[in-house]
């Protein structure tokens, strides 16, 4: 079953993206480089609690 995970920008803390992942295969926190509209550039986005 997919779990909804919200990604927040590391620099400005803006919550820009939401994804669904498999809970069993992704036990650690998700990190991706994505475009942040607030910063207007590509930054690291981490999963929030």
Curated annotation (Swiss-Prot):
GO terms for cellular component: cytoplasm; ribonucleoprotein complex; ribosome. Disulfide bonds: none annotated. One of its GO terms (biological process) is translation. Keywords: Ribonucleoprotein, Ribosomal protein. The keyword Ribonucleoprotein applies. InterPro entries: Ribosomal_bL33, Ribosomal_bL33_sf, Ribosomal_zn-bd. GO terms for molecular function: structural constituent of ribosome. It holds the Pfam family Ribosomal_L33. It comes from the Bacteria. The keyword Ribosomal protein applies. Belongs to the bacterial ribosomal protein bL33 family. PANTHER family: 50S RIBOSOMAL PROTEIN L33, CHLOROPLASTIC (PTHR43168), LARGE RIBOSOMAL SUBUNIT PROTEIN BL33B (PTHR43168:SF5). HAMAP family: Ribosomal_bL33. This is Large ribosomal subunit protein bL33. The lineage of its organism: Bacteria, Bacillati, Bacillota, Bacilli, Bacillales.
């Amino acid at each position: 079953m997919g779990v909804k995970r919200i990604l927040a920008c590391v620099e400005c803390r803006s919550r820009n993206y939401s994804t669904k992942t498999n809970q069993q295969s992704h036990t650690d926190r998700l990190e991706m480089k994505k475009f942040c509209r607030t910063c207007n550039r590509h930054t690291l986005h981490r999963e929030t609690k």
